[in-house]
């Protein structure tokens, strides 16, 4: 009786380890064989695509440093990492830097060796880091939308536009965050988020509750008013808020997954997906084999006529 259960790595789209002398299909033993995480259906030149990712990462990094300095100057530096908004923003920065560097590395190899040259995360990095990259990607294209929706539905208001500083903060952290996530979803060839990462993202959201209540016990305030179980906060509605956010994440995750599926189909239809050198080499090998057989046949026929 065969065991058809897939490992956690396999569910993330990461192939199992293969021995050096083991014969198997190239794609089946390679992470991201079609280089989807480092290519775009819109920006065909990977240098441009990688550069745009780095620019986004630099903007997020600069704004993060400036906002953190403001927290520190107001004596609130120790609470900066207590906010889910800030944690998500830092996650965006980390992802765009990581993906940007990988894309630039791919572009350099692409220039030397062609489109199927690969990139470091794909070819030489351990499966553990490949898995973390997939999980980080799953949070990057879902959590910013949760942050933006919750903020403008429950927390934001006219007061955020009272000063230039607060307006810039609101735009950068609560609007552009979702815009960057949407761009990553629509303008890249990254595959649909694996379903196995849905419970992982729910677990991360649940874990944040621990951060929020540890912050209350150690610093004496609730990071978000709806997490306050007292009558001054959300009161009896607290479970509804928590469950609602979890359900919202499930719905959002599903929507994001199928948007990526649709984008992949459109990219394939309009031939916006790179044809890998590996495939070209296979075709050339088949062509040479057929050519060799034809030459041998002609030689036999020529010998027979002689």
Across the structure, where does each feature detected by a protein language model lie?
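Alpha-helical transmembrane segments of multipass membrane proteins
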Residues: 204-215, 248-256
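Non-transmembrane, juxtamembrane loop and terminal tail segments
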Residues: 1-39, 112-123, 269-306
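Membrane-lumen (extracellular) interface motif
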Residues: 63-87, 151-170, 185-199, 214-236
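Membrane-interface transmembrane-helix boundary segments in multi-pass integral membrane proteins
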Residues: 44-48, 219-257, 276-281
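Helical transmembrane-bundle signal
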Residues: 56-67, 92-99, 141-151, 181-184, ...
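Transmembrane alpha-helices of multi-pass eukaryotic membrane proteins
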Residues: 45-60, 78-99, 128-144, 163-177, ...
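Transmembrane-helix exit/juxtamembrane "anchor" motif
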Residues: 100-109, 251-275
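First transmembrane helix
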Residues: 21-36, 49-71, 92-100
């Amino acid at each position: 009786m065969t065991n058809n259960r897939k490992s956690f790595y396999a569910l993330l789209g990461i192939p199992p380890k293969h021995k050096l002398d083991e014969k198997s299909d190239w794609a089946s033993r390679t992470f991201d064989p079609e280089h989807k995480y480092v290519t775009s259906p819109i920006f065909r030149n990977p240098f441009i695509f990688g550069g745009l990712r780095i620019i986004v990462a630099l903007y997020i990094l600069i704004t993060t440093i400036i906002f953190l300095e403001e927290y520190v100057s107001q004596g609130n530096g120790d609470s900066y990492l207590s906010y889910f908004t800030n944690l998500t923003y830092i996650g965006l920065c980390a992802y765009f830097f990581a993906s940007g560097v990988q894309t630039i590395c791919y572009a350099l190899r692409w220039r030397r060796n062609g489109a199927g040259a690969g990139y470091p995360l794909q070819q030489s990095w351990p499966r553990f880091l490949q898995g973390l990259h997939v999980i980080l990607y799953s949070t990057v294209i879902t959590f910013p939308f949760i942050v933006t929706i919750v903020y403008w539905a429950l927390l934001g208001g006219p007061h955020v536009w009272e000063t230039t500083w607060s307006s810039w903060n609101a735009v950068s952290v609560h609007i552009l965050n979702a815009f960057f996530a949407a761009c990553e979803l629509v303008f890249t060839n990254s595959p649909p988020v694996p379903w196995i990462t849905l419970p992982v993202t729910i677990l991360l959201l649940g874990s944040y509750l621990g951060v929020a209540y540890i912050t209350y016990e150690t610093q004496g305030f609730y990071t978000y008013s709806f997490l306050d179980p007292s009558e001054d906060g959300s009161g009896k509605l607290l479970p509804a808020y928590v469950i609602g956010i979890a359900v919202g994440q499930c719905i959002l995750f599903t929507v994001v997954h199928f948007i990526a599926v649709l984008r992949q189909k459109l990219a394939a239809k309009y031939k916006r997906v790179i044809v890998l050198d590996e495939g070209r080499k296979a075709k050339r090998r088949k062509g040479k084999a057929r050519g060799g057989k034809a030459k041998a046949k002609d030689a036999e026929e020529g010998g027979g006529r002689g």
